[in-house]
């Protein structure tokens, strides 16, 4: 079950995330769960696999914003790093980084099972 304690153990800055959700725990947890269903996780991996850098950037950037607003630090940091690599068109294979973000999402989803 997803709780504030499981989010803290995951590495989220729960106090910051709660602050953005008017200190409403139920609302914050609902927003976290909604973020885990964001289709941009899959879009990011697919775009990275097909080397569609524009689509990968859009998905990574969108995820970075959502995850940062909820203070899901491990995922937002990874999405932020990938966003900047894509923004700068840094040469490289983006698939491992995209899959790492997806794996973090799956790890957090498993905590909600």
Language model feature labels by segment:
Residues 1-113:
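Two-component system phosphorelay core
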């Amino acid at each position: 079950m997803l709780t504030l304690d499981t989010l803290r153990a995951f590495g989220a800055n729960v106090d910051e995330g709660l602050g953005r959700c008017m200190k409403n725990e139920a609302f914050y947890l609902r927003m976290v769960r909604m973020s885990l269903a964001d289709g941009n996780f899959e879009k990011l991996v697919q775009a990275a696999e097909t080397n569609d850098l524009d689509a990968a950037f859009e998905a990574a950037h969108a995820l970075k914003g959502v995850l940062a607003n909820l203070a899901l630090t491990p995922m937002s940091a990874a999405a932020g790093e990938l966003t900047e690599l894509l923004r700068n068109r840094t040469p490289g294979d983006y698939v491992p980084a995209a899959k790492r973000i997806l794996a973090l999402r799956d790890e957090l989803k498993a905590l909600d099972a």
